[in-house]
Amino acid sequence: MKYGVYSIIDRAAEEFGPIYQSSNDAVARRRFDMLLSDLNVAFPDDFKLFKLGEFDNSTGILTGFDKPEEVYFPKDDEIQNLRIREVK
């Protein structure tokens, strides 16, 4: 099965974080949303989710894209909604 390979960029630091795999963009976004809902994340609007490539777990082949693809950059109101759900 092919999995997407993702990373979150910190726009203030101008660097990508650790990579992780997810079965699709929706699952990767859910994981990203969980991170942003954490009230300990001080500047959630500094982060964007990118897809870097694909990993085929049956062949072990990792294929990177020529350029990272932006998957999700939440708006301020979306971040607020995530954080409100976390507090409840």
Where are these regions (language model features)?
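Conserved short hydrophobic patches within well-ordered secondary structure
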Residues: 7-8, 21, 48-50
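A short, charged, amphipathic alpha-helix used as a generic interaction element across diverse proteins
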Residues: 23-44
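Short aromatic-glycine-(Arg/Gly/Cys) micro-motifs in beta-strand/loop hairpins
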Residues: 1-16
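Short, mixed-charge low-complexity intrinsically disordered segments
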Residues: 37-88
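Short, intrinsically disordered low-complexity segments
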Residues: 10, 30, 82-84
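Eukaryotic short linear interaction motifs
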Residues: 15-16, 29, 58-59
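A short, exposed loop/beta-hairpin motif centered on an aromatic-Gly-Thr core
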Residues: 15-24
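Generic structural motif
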Residues: 11, 25, 52-55
